[in-house]
Each structure stands twice: as structure tokens, then as C-alpha cells.
Amino acid sequence: MLLTITSCEIESAHITEPTINEENGHEFVDLGLSVRWATMNVGAVKPEEFGSYFAWGETLPKETYTEESYTYKATTQILPLSDDAARVNWGGRWRIPNPDELMELIENCNWTYTYTPDLNLYGYKVTSKINGKSIFLPTAEVFSGDKITSSTMYGYGAY
């Protein structure tokens, strides 16, 4: 599975800044959860872009994604920051969300599958049940070997 969504740790329990803010030059949204969520994927310049493709534990995109080209062999679900694509590429306090944070996002948000015809774009609008703020997760194609397979019209993709 490919994850490019990112989160940013919260330093205090009481947050008073605006709903959309920045960490190290990248915007985030406070969904009222334990971490702040990026408005776009690593490697994207707009929320509707897929961003870069990363293998788990690798910090640079590559041209081929096969078992032979995979360099990260650890089986941990939480990456050391030196192997975290968000931290290495965006700096600051950015990092890939851990499984508990992903579950929190799933359980505390409404997920609406959407299609934007003028952009030919499928994805999920993820809206907080806590404060009504949202992020958009485009359903990206799946990169296998050196080929990209479109799977966006079926509601699944790589995140």
C-alpha cells in the first residue's frame, strides 16, 4: 500500500490559530483530531494533485516499484523520521500518520466519494464530524513495477 497523506503533530491541547495554517511552508487543516492534516499530498502543488509516489520507508520517488527495487526492509508500522517521506521532503514536524491516527481520521470524519468532471478527478472529501472542516484525498493511480494503473473510477487508489 502506498501512503502519501501527511500529518503534523500538535504541541498543545488548546488550539487558537485559524482553521487553515502552515507548518514549514505547507498548509494544514485542523480537523479537531489529535494531529493536523495536510491539505495536499507530498509532491503535489495543489490539493487535487496526486503528488509523488513513495514506497513505504523510502523518501525519494523512483521509476520502478518492484520487490527488487524496494530498499526498506523493516516491517514496522511507524517509521523512524529519517525514513519518513513527509519529514524528509517537507521538514518541520511533518510525518506520515501512524495507524491509530489513520483510524481516528476514518472514525471521526464523513467520507464522501466525489467526481469533478472539469478536472476528471475522483477522490474523497473527508469532513470532520467534530468541527465540519475538510480535506480532499484524490484517488491516485496504482504504480506497479514501471506501470501506472488507473483505478480512480472505482473509488480506490493509493493514499
Locate the predicted segments by residue.
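Conserved positions within compact, well-structured domain cores
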Residues: 12-159
